[in-house]
Amino acid sequence: MPAARSLNDRLIVPVAPIVAEAGADTTYARFSLFDADVAPGSDIDMCVFNSANALVGSSGSGTSAEEVNLTNPAAGNYTVVVQGWGVDGSSPFKLHTWLLGSAAAGNMTVSAPASAVLGQTGTISLSFSGLAAGTKYLGSIAYSGATGMPSPTIVRVDTP
């Protein structure tokens, strides 16, 4: 489960492009902004473009809590454009970027039954180790054995 890569002290001027590179093994990408990481009352929005400059995702709401998710993104550079929609001049922000691959990071353990029965409930437990304090992490859980399973399940952990 990788920690978010953050860009601190960027200013919204009104548009700030940031480049993230997805590798051939990237299975999931998430780009997030959080209200707590901007000045109170700010409204910033986000667009994500692939290496061909095609829009692949956007998020714009009345706040600064924005998120774009890409499942199995093509390898290449992605440009994230953060725009100040409702800010008073320049406003610092933090962009959180996660690029998940198929390899386990070794800091999340999943305990689940070996099989499931249609129509019945089961318990799946997650435990975490070695996570740094004050960090946002993102991971995924993949399922096997049957078609139609929700794969992957995305898990975000914010450590105190």
Feature names for model-found ranges:
Residues 1-13, 56-62, 115:
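Extracellular beta-rich ligand/substrate-recognition surface
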Residues 6-54, 131, 140:
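Acidic, Ser/Thr/Pro-rich low-complexity intrinsically disordered segments
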Residues 17-19, 65-71, 125-127:
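Exposed aromatic-hydrophobic patches
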Residues 36, 61-64, 155-160:
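Short, solvent-exposed aromatic-acidic interface loops
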Residues 47-96:
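Noncatalytic accessory or regulatory domains flanking protease catalytic cores in secreted, cell-surface
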